[in-house]
């Protein structure tokens, strides 16, 4: 599959390409494998694998995101989240799950936690906000729905803008060094060097909830 994508990338003009493929084992376990290929390093490829969990109806990523403490955390996408992402980020109804996953893998390279409480988290991305529910039993952050930037309230926008430029910068660096060279970038230390702390982000987004009461 990766070789096929490399051939497609060589024929086209795109900077990178991503495709998502279905895979099922003999015991009927369903997987979705997203393969990312970058023109700048065409001999290498990056992939994420999602396992479908029928009991909870979500796609659990076998790889990890970085939380604010720079430690690995597992996450999953619900079908509802993927539908809302397609509708609100891409303006498309009834997009296939594979196409939505491929777009997320291609366009969202880095995320930043900007709010959390005992039950939920809010993660900022280049496309908008992921609203997550914490599943303590499974140790997974479940992405329940997606909020595009144009839907944000004024206090939410303030929190988002604090990290928007950094997300863009880190997305470019992530694509360059982490996806291709497997070198981890440290967002937390960079934020601290710019005078931005986790408390700043949480307080900014938290104003939205204070004003809502």
Give the predicted meaning of each segment:
Residues 1-213:
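Ribonuclease/tRNase effector modules and their secretory precursors
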């Amino acid at each position: 599959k990766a070789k096929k994508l490399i051939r497609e990338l060589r024929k086209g003009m795109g900077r990178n390409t991503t495709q998502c493929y279905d895979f099922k084992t003999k015991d009927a376990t369903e997987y979705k494998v997203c393969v990312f290929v970058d023109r700048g390093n065409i001999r290498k490829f990056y992939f994420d694998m999602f396992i479908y969990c029928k009991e909870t109806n979500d796609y659990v990523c076998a790889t990890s995101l970085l939380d604010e403490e720079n430690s690995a955390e597992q996450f999953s996408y619900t079908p509802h989240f993927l539908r809302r992402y397609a509708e609100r980020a891409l303006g498309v109804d009834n997009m296939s799950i594979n196409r939505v996953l491929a777009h997320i893998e291609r366009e969202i390279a880095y995320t930043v936690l900007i709010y959390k409480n005992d039950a939920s988290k809010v993660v900022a991305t280049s496309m908008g906000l992921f609203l997550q529910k914490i599943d303590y039993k499974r140790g997974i952050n479940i992405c329940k729905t997606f909020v595009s930037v144009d839907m944000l309230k004024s206090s939410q926008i303030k929190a988002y803008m604090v990290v928007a430029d950094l997300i863009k910068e880190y997305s470019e660096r992530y694509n360059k060094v982490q996806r291709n060279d497997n070198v981890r970038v440290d967002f937390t230390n960079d934020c601290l060097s710019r005078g931005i702390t986790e408390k700043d982000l949480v307080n900014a987004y938290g104003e939205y909830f204070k004003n809502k009461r």
